[in-house]
A protein has these predicted regions:
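Ordered, helix-dominated protein-protein interaction surfaces in large eukaryotic regulatory proteins
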Residues: 3, 22, 71, 89, ...
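Short, solvent-exposed turn/loop segments enriched in Gly/Ser/Thr/Pro and often Arg
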Residues: 202-205, 250-256, 479-487, 545-554
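Substrate-gating cap/lid region and adjacent catalytic-acid/histidine neighborhood
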Residues: 283, 322-520, 529, 536, ...
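Serine-hydrolase-like catalytic core of hydrolytic proteins
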Residues: 28-46, 130-316, 325, 359-391, ...
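Surface-exposed patches in mature extracellular/periplasmic domains of secreted proteins
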Residues: 307-320, 334-336, 440-441, 477, ...
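C-terminal transmembrane bundle
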Residues: 498-500, 560-563
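Alpha-helical packing segments of well-folded alpha/beta enzyme cores
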Residues: 145-148, 229, 460, 526, ...
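Non-catalytic accessory segments of hydrolases
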Residues: 2-12, 18-223, 244, 345, ...
């Protein structure tokens, strides 16, 4: 069900200032004419001059043509925003599933005063009207014509090149929009005088359906949308006062995984200079699939919407041609049915290891990469797994305390860690059970939250940080531990996935929100850390050496900081015991038991063949016996 369309609100029309002729009596009264006339002309001239200066600030010429932006207010002063800038041709009709094409030049002036359409996607209807889910749902009309980006820049425009932050939204590669209120760039830009860019990219089947080897649906076109936006930044951000030689890419969840994939893809690597990965990593178990699984999901979707199955050859063209005839909402309605099994924190269409954008698996590329001199900021929130439990884990709901039974915990491990052997699942249960209180519902709830969070976010991020640091990168790490006073999710969920973003973007500074005074100060601190990192590659405050220092993360010391209302606290070992289990022990267990699993499969296959043979023999014997009895009559 698509969200209701919201009325687009454009800028107020400026009143034309009409120059009035002074009254004749003033012109003929020497004692009054000069002062009053000068005052009148000064007031009128000042108004016209101010409007002229504003027009100059809001008119920008980029390679494609001219843009008119809008002036936005913040408590600290105005910023200029250029919203809904087209950077690619609409990927509709015959362009569906294909790589993006740069936007052709236009004539006239593009109205860049309001956000444009959101890319077609699944809309969360699990808890209708609930702020915790609605804040992530599309807030503009859904369309395949959605490849637009936004630029916020200080007002007045910087006279010297200013560092640029480029945001990539999350949403499991199946949802997301740059126009969400939580991504409003005005507060960060005004407070830190950076330039901020965000872009839409295709999600779900439109961005990540893949028939490897096919030119018609090569896969990863959502990542290519992001890359094209980064190329646009290199070509055009100077017109907004931005510095194309100082671009920091930052994202959260699937956006963070995307940032990591651009780090691992040589054609993208030269388009930015620093990276921030919030609650996501390219090596997460949900972030990519292999070519075989990508093809299976694509053909399964085709089957579900009534398109003929594709093969490895020419049939792919017919399959894609059929998929292009299906309404966008029909594809969205069937996306979730292609997953191989019931699970949480798994998504239908995601980046594929295609040998092109990703020449190998993220793990292999991380292990083999040269990251000397790279500057990276990574982190997680305190309770990464809790958000996902209400989307399918047995016994969980936002509307109660989710005090689960032992049986629900065991079933939850199977959906939280899908596609592993029974032995591996049992190892997870053994590691996460509090054996002093193995039946305690609250402890079981927390344990399953940790299973999902550690497996999918915390330990992939820790692994990435350690590998990058060991290979010469300068890495900073954090755990975000503040639960917002405005959070609508229940207390048992703690600090859920995604709820640091509002502080990074300075949303507490919005006077229409009900954050505390301490949270406003906290948001200013976080914006300063992120902006410092964008400026220098170091989040620490260079102007205040007495301030608490945020040390680099190294493979040996593993130092990170806790981010909450208190001053920085330095800690060591990001979930070290749990991550040793996921990153060291479990892979060895799976490798060691691989042959056992294969032997079990072979034994079951032989047993099935033997059982089928015995059934067939019995049927033949019964048939013979009946014939023999009939011949005796």
């Amino acid at each position: 069900m698509a969200p209701k369309k919201k009325r687009k609100v454009g800028p107020k029309k400026k009143r034309k200032v009409k120059l009035m002729r002074p009254p004749q009596c003033l012109l003929h009264t020497p004692s009054l004419a000069s002062p009053l006339l000068l005052l009148l002309l000064w007031l009128l001239g000042g108004g016209v001059g101010a409007e002229g200066r504003e027009d100059a600030e809001l008119l920008v010429t980029v390679r494609g043509g001219r843009l008119r932006g809008i002036r936005l207010k913040t408590p600290g002063g105005p910023v200029s925003a250029f919203l809904g800038i087209p950077f690619a041709e609409p990927p509709m009709g015959p362009r569906r599933f294909l790589p993006p094409e740069p936007k052709q030049p236009w004539s006239g002036v593009v109205d860049a005063t309001t956000f444009q359409s959101v890319c077609y996607q699944y809309v969360d209807t699990l808890y209708p009207g609930f702020e915790g889910t609605e804040m992530w749902n599309p807030n503009r009309e859904l369309s395949e014509d959605c490849l637009y980006l936004n630029v916020w820049t200080p007002y007045p425009r910087p006279t010297s090149p200013t560092p640029v932050l480029v945001w990539i939204y999350g949403g499991g590669f199946y949802s997301g929009a740059s126009s969400l209120d939580v991504y409003d760039g005005r507060f960060l830009v005004q407070a830190e005088r950076t330039v901020l860019v965000s872009m839409n990219y295709r999600v779900g089947a439109f961005g990540f359906l893949a028939l490897p080897g096919s030119r018609e649906a090569p896969g990863n076109v959502g990542l290519l949308d992001q890359r094209l936006a980064l190329q646009w930044v290199q070509e055009n951000v100077a017109a907004f006062g931005g510095d194309p030689t100082s671009v920091t890419l930052f994202g959260e969840s699937a956006g963070a995984a995307s940032v990591g994939m651009h780090l691992l893809s040589p054609p993208s690597r030269g388009l930015f200079h620093r990276a921030v990965l919030q609650s996501g990593a390219p090596n997460g178990p949900w972030a990519t699939v292999g070519m075989g699984e990508a093809r299976r999901r694509a053909t399964q979707l085709a089957h579900l919407v009534g398109c003929p199955p594709g093969g490895t050859g020419g049939n792919d063209t017919e399959l894609v041609a059929c998929l292009r005839t299906r309404p966008a909402q029909v594809l969205v309605n069937h996306e979730w049915h292609v997953l191989p099994q019931e699970s949480v924190f798994r998504f239908s269409f995601v980046p594929v290891v295609d040998g092109d954008f990703l020449s190998d698996t993220p793990e292999a590329l991380i292990n083999a990469g040269d990251f000397h001199g790279l500057q990276v900021l990574v982190g997680v929130v305190k309770d990464e797994g809790s958000y996902f439990l209400v989307y399918g884990a047995p016994g969980f709901s936002k509307d109660n305390e989710s005090l689960i039974s032992r049986a629900e915990f065991l079933a939850g491990v199977r959906v939280g860690v899908p596609q592993v052997s029974d032995l591996a699942a049992e190892a997870v249960v053994l590691h996460y059970t509090d054996w002093l209180h193995p039946e305690d519902p609250a402890r079981l709830r927390e344990a399953l939250s940790d299973v999902v969070g550690d497996h999918n976010v915390v330990c992939p991020v820790a692994q990435l940080a350690g590998r990058l640091a060991a290979q010469g990168a300068r890495v900073y790490a954090y755990v975000f531990e503040h639960r917002a006073s405005t959070l609508s999710w229940p207390l048992w969920m703690g600090v859920p996935h995604g709820y640091e973003i509002e502080f990074i973007f300075g949303i507490p500074l919005d006077p229409s929100r009900n954050y505390t005074a301490e949270e406003k100060i906290f948001a200013q601190r976080l914006m300063r850390y992120w902006a410092n990192f964008a400026r220098t590659g170091d989040p620490n405050e260079p102007r205040d050496p007495k301030a608490p220092q945020w040390p680099p993360y190294t493979a040996g010391a593993q130092q990170y900081v806790s981010l909450d209302l208190r001053p920085l606290e330095v800690r060591r070992g990001l979930r070290a015991q749990a991550c040793a289990f996921w990153n060291r022990f479990l892979p060895k267990l799976l490798s060691a038991t691989d042959t056992l699993d294969e032997a079990e499969r072979q034994w079951k296959a032989e047993f099935h063949r033997w059982s089928s043979y015995m059934v067939h023999w019995k049927n033949q014997f019964d048939h013979y016996s009946k014939q023999d009895r009939c011949s005796d009559l």
